[in-house]
């Protein structure tokens, strides 16, 4: 989470970050109810995201972040439109056997669990089961999109999915090692993401 916040603060070109969780983790949105999250998923470590959205169980998902500078049209578009554009790209990255489509939002019911509440432009299968969702946050620097796809995958599938998503979202792209300044990340963890008070604040 600290790396994602740093990416939003320093973004000058679009960045797609794909990562795995070490251990058993759940996350909740910036405005989520911590006690409700604990009732939904037991015996996990928790972190509060910098974005909105519901409760996500990261024990069995594929997690990515897409950060877009404010110089890009999609970063300045309304929330629903940026969500649609990014998830349209995600459709192309997912296995076609899943028959993924974008949700029209008609099944949204206000459930706190992300994958039980398909909102408009979430990725769902042919019968409406949610396959992918995300939370977003905007700043003067750009747009932070933190996404989760249901179901874990091995490294080969993850790399292929990452490359397909990058190709769907960009005319040109390349791979680079992401090396955030350790002291900056440590300070963000100490000030926010590593604090029990931050995680449990609502």
Which stretches of residues belong to each language-model region?
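Contiguous, small/hydrophobic- and glycine-enriched helical/loop subdomains that border
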Residues: 63-110
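Generic non-transmembrane alpha-helical segments
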Residues: 6, 89-97, 164-172
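Short, conserved charged micro-motifs
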Residues: 38, 73-79, 155-161
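A contiguous pocket-lining binding segment that forms or flanks enzyme active sites
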Residues: 95, 99-156
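C-terminal accessory segment of soluble enzyme catalytic cores
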Residues: 124-125, 137-202
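Residues forming anionic-ligand binding surfaces in small-molecule and nucleic-acid pockets
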Residues: 50-73, 145
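Active-site loop/lid in soluble adenylation, ligation, and acyl-transfer enzymes
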Residues: 1-41, 48-49, 55, 170-202
């Amino acid at each position: 989470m600290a790396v994602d916040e740093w990416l939003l603060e320093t973004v000058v070109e679009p960045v797609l970050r794909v990562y795995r969780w070490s251990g058993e983790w759940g996350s909740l949105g910036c405005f989520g109810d911590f006690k409700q999250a604990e009732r939904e998923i037991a015996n996990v470590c928790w972190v509060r995201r910098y974005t909105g959205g519901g409760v996500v169980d990261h024990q069995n998902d594929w997690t990515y972040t897409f950060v877009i500078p404010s110089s890009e049209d999609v970063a300045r578009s309304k929330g629903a439109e940026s969500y649609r554009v990014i998830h349209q790209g995600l459709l192309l990255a997912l296995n076609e056997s899943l028959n993924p489509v974008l949700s029209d939002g008609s099944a949204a019911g206000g459930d706190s669990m992300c994958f039980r509440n398909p909102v408009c432009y979430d990725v769902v299968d042919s019968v409406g089961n949610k396959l992918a969702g995300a939370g977003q946050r905007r700043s003067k620097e750009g747009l932070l999109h933190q996404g989760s796809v249901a179901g874990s995958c091995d490294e080969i599938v993850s790399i292929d999915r990452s490359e397909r998503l990058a190709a769907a979202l960009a005319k040109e792209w390349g791979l680079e090692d992401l090396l955030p300044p350790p002291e900056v990340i440590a300070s963000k963890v100490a000030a926010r993401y590593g604090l029990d008070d931050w995680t449990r604040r609502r």
